[in-house]
UniProtKB/Swiss-Prot annotation:
The gene is rplY. InterPro entries: Rbsml_bL25/Gln-tRNA_synth_N, Ribosomal_bL25/Gln-tRNA_synth, Ribosomal_bL25_b-dom, Ribosomal_bL25_C, Ribosomal_bL25_long, Ribosomal_L25_dom, Ribosomal_uL5_bac-type. SUPFAM superfamilies: Ribosomal protein L25-like (SSF50715). This is Large ribosomal subunit protein bL25. It comes from Methylibium petroleiphilum (strain ATCC BAA-1232 / LMG 22953 / PM1). PANTHER family: RIBOSOMAL PROTEIN L25/GLN-TRNA SYNTHETASE, ANTI-CODON-BINDING DOMAIN-CONTAINING PROTEIN, RIBOSOMAL PROTEIN L25_GLN-TRNA SYNTHETASE, ANTI-CODON-BINDING DOMAIN-CONTAINING PROTEIN. Residues 188-214 are annotated as: Disordered. Belongs to the bacterial ribosomal protein bL25 family. CTC subfamily. This is one of the proteins that binds to the 5S RNA in the ribosome where it forms part of the central protuberance. One of its GO terms (molecular function) is structural constituent of ribosome. HAMAP family: Ribosomal_bL25_CTC. Residues 188-203 have a biased composition (Low complexity).
Length: 214
């Protein structure tokens, strides 16, 4: 994905506030040299941030007529308004090793025996994983095939088919669960409400006791 950045001349809290009022977003690019202070068009950045690829893939930043490869590292949003306050990028090249969280794309869920045969549901325990690799080989996402998952089974990190150069960063966790089949609770049948027995109507032609005594 591509985006355009411009030099940010003014600095400080007041300058950043005026920049935001004018529809711009202050940002910084660090790594492989001196930090580069930039500004971006707010609306263009806001819409780009809605795309998954903008968060988890190499980006081509056009700056002063030249292209640089960067990764999105941090976004600061306003507490209650749909406004981007600040953005950080990391400058990288093909030889830079990076760690980055990438989303998981789950496929074949409807074909899993635990779903198709046993009417279970698949719980997605995690939806993204942190990976380490060369910047040039960073995957936009990881595909998780759930097609063989049966009742009572779980899919773990070690079960994933990763690109050869990509390694999952576990940070002390041992083979965590990615997804698991859970069974739906059986619905209890509603209790039958006893219907009161209607009193039998008195037979025709019979007189009451009082009438017989007369």
């Amino acid at each position: 994905m591509k985006f355009v950045a411009y030099p940010r001349e003014l600095q400080g809290t007041g300058a950043s506030r005026r920049l935001r009022i004018s529809g711009k977003v202050p940002g910084i690019v660090y790594g492989a040299g001196e930090p580069l202070k930039i500004e971006l068009d707010h609306n263009a950045l806001f819409h780009a941030l809605k795309k998954e690829a903008f968060h988890a893939s190499l980006l081509d930043m056009e700056f002063n007529g030249k292209s640089q490869q960067v990764l999105l590292r941090d976004v600061q949003m306003h507490a209650f308004r749909p406004q981007v306050l600040h953005v950080d990028f990391q400058r990288v090249d093909a030889t830079t090793r990076v760690t980055k969280k990438v989303p998981l794309h789950f496929v074949n869920e409807e074909n899993a025996p635990g779903v198709k045969l046993d009417k279970g549901l698949i719980s997605h325990v995690v939806t993204e994983l942190e990976v380490e690799c060369l910047a040039s080989q960073l995957p936009e996402y990881l595909t998780v095939d759930l097609g063989e998952l049966a009742k009572g089974q779980s899919l773990h990190v070690n079960d994933l088919k990763l690109p050869p150069s990509v390694k999952v960063v576990l940070r002390g966790k041992k083979n965590p669960v990615i997804a698991t089949v859970v069974m739906q609770a059986a619905e209890e049948a509603p209790a039958e409400v006893a219907t009161p027995t209607a009193a039998a109507p008195a037979a025709k032609g019979k007189k009451s006791e009082k009438q017989n005594k007369k």
